From Swiss-Prot:
The record marks 98-99 as: Contributes to redox potential value. This is Thioredoxin M-type, chloroplastic. PANTHER family: GEO12009P1 (PTHR45663), THIOREDOXIN M5, CHLOROPLASTIC (PTHR45663:SF42). Residues 61-172 form the Thioredoxin domain. The keyword Plastid applies. It is found in: Plastid, Chloroplast. Belongs to the thioredoxin family. Plant M-type subfamily. It comes from the Eukaryota. It comes from Pisum sativum.
């Protein structure tokens, strides 16, 4: 990862007497030795945000683009979708739905192609019925598009990738 390489480079150029702290997933980690960096990065394989402080000065605050579809549910909806500054695509699906399984690889491809430009989430309607009801989801798969916390568009059914790509391009 690019952030990991940058952090290792900074760590090797900084004296061990310096206070080096990185924060990920809301947890702070103080690096006090060269061996500690190896342990820390084993834990960082899936980090999406990093804040680096040296001697109490913020040196780096970076986010990596998430290039895979993440799960959203009733409890995380407001934070991940409504609170997002990046446009959002949400796939409403259920495990028993054949067309949902057909469209899933297309959503995965879009997440990779548009990493950093759009966030892609999937919401299991069986596990999160409140959000599905709130947005009037009556057929699945349904893909909703949000920008600045507002619902902008929807696509119902298993559609070709080109249809979804066109919608994504409209909102990025």
């Amino acid at each position: 990862m690019a952030l990991e390489s940058l952090f290792k480079s900074i760590h090797t150029k900084t004296s061990l007497s310096s206070s080096i702290v990185f924060i990920f997933k809301g947890k702070a980690c103080l690096l006090t030795s060269k061996s500690r960096i190896q342990e820390s990065f084993a834990e960082l394989n899936s980090f999406t945000s990093l804040v680096l402080l040296i001697e109490n000065h913020v040196l780096l605050h970076a986010r990596e683009a998430v290039n895979e579809v993440q799960v959203v549910n009733d409890s995380s909806w407001d934070e991940l979708v409504i609170g997002s500054e990046t446009p959002v695509l949400v796939d409403f699906w259920a495990p028993w739905c054949g067309p949902c399984r057909m469209i899933a690889p297309i959503i995965d491809e879009l997440a990779k192609e548009y990493a950093g430009k759009i966030k892609c989430y999937k919401l299991n309607t069986d596990e999160s019925p409140n959000t599905a009801t709130k947005y009037g989801i009556r057929s699945i798969p349904t893909v909703l598009f949000f920008k600045n916390g507002e619902r902008k568009d929807s696509v119902i059914g298993a559609v070709p990738k080109a249809t979804l790509s066109e919608k994504v391009e409209k909102y990025i």
